[in-house]
Amino acid sequence: MMMLNPSNGGIEGEKMKKKAKVVVIMGPTGSGKSKLAVDLASHFPVEIINADAMQIYSGLDVLTNKVTVDEQKGVPHHLLGTVSSDMEFTARDFRDFTVPLIEEIVSRNHIPVLVGGTHYYIQAVVSKFLLDDAAEDTEECCADVASVVDQDMVVESVFGRDDLSHGYELLKELDPVAANRIHPNNHRKINQYLSLHASRGVLPSKLYQGKTAENWGCINASRFDYCLICMDAETAVLDRYVEQRVDAMVDAGLLDEVYDIYKPGADYTRGLRQSIGVREFEDFLKIHLSETCAGHLTSLSNDDKVMKENLRKILNFPKDDKLRIMLEEAIDRVKLNTRRLLRRQKRRVSRLETVFGWNIHYIDATEYILSKSEESWNAQVVKPASEIIRCFLETETESGRDPTSGKSIERDLWTQYVCEACGNKILRGRHEWEHHKQGRTHRKRTTRHKNSQTYKNREVQEAEVN
């Protein structure tokens, strides 16, 4: 008889010490993660925890591709559309919410299944060591920096209002090592670091040393025992699928959702507006609304409800119509950015293996995506995934960590690389830099850069001779 979860209160004393078992399903967008998680309920008593950063927010159900109530098939789903759209929900927030939730699910003798493509969310739960903990724990001990508003006040009182507006440059002067770790536009993190220094006299980089930095992202001493599954498919097949999915989203009401959330001059770095498919329509909506309100489009009513209903009609305007061109370009940008996203997600999964030593089981959904056959889905996806999980539940040894890897590439958390050939693109850490150098775009630009430099050098030499 299979033991579902060794952490249940009814298990014998020695088994109570064993870690609870958690299934993780990750992978690129469009690969079928949510569908697999729901179908596993036919084989195991599962509860699903959403690990998609945008699906956590309420709203934009079509655009973020949330599983519908019908698609959930009665399987319990958690953290799906539960966070206010304007809130910032960090990896630490996700971890702090999810860990107790996993324990709660285990107490019901059910199997928690963590599902999503936001791999830094998953990493925050799977790894016991979250790199930002040291800094944030220090903040919590200091009443002067208890909120974002207070952080601004602390930084302003010490460095002045003018310096506050140039926070990244100030941080580079104070602690260049810490500045290298974050993006120049990450104002929340910049203020966090500056407030630490202002209130405690501590260099942020000093906090990221020792055990936390050494074990960051690894599964050493993890809270639970993890079965790590990655849904995958050929990139070209996923490209075609996500493009078709965007078209289907437009038919299903994507434009209505974007219209509802549109706000001129909105902050696209926080909350639900970070979603792919929001910012891409900003220019189109700005022109569309201004012309409609000015009465230039007599064929469309100014009534809010009717305007939303007529958005898709713009796609039937003459091909040379400015609004139709802008709308089609916006839809194409959504497709492009979605294709880019799935490539980033694939790279991140690979990094979890090569850099952090995760033992990941891959399930190839290519045949199903091409055929749309439920027979193929069951044979190529559900059956192998169920066998992997069944073996995981029956084994006594931990499954998530691969002891033979994880140190294959030295992790460099603090070094920033700048690629001049690619327009001064910033890469953080040796792994990102090495991966970037192998890319086709970088190689092409490097070749052009070298040829251009050779030509310039030849011109200089000829000028000196003459």
From Swiss-Prot:
It catalyses: adenosine(37) in tRNA + dimethylallyl diphosphate = N(6)-dimethylallyladenosine(37) in tRNA + diphosphate. InterPro entries: Dimethylallyltransferase (IPR039657), IPP_transferase_euk (IPR030666), IPT (IPR018022), P-loop_NTPase (IPR027417). GO terms for biological process: cytokinin biosynthetic process; tRNA processing. It is an enzyme of class 2 (transferase). Residues 433-466 are annotated as: Disordered. Disruption phenotype: No visible phenotype, due the redundancy with IPT9. Its cofactor is Mg(2+). It comes from Arabidopsis thaliana. The record marks 118 as: Interaction with substrate tRNA. Its EC number is 2.5.1.75. This is tRNA dimethylallyltransferase 2. Belongs to the IPP transferase family. Substrate binds at residues 29-34. ATP binds at residues 27-34. Residues 456-466 have a biased composition (Basic and acidic residues). The gene is IPT2. Gene3D superfamilies: 1.10.20.140, Classic Zinc Finger, P-loop containing nucleotide triphosphate hydrolases.
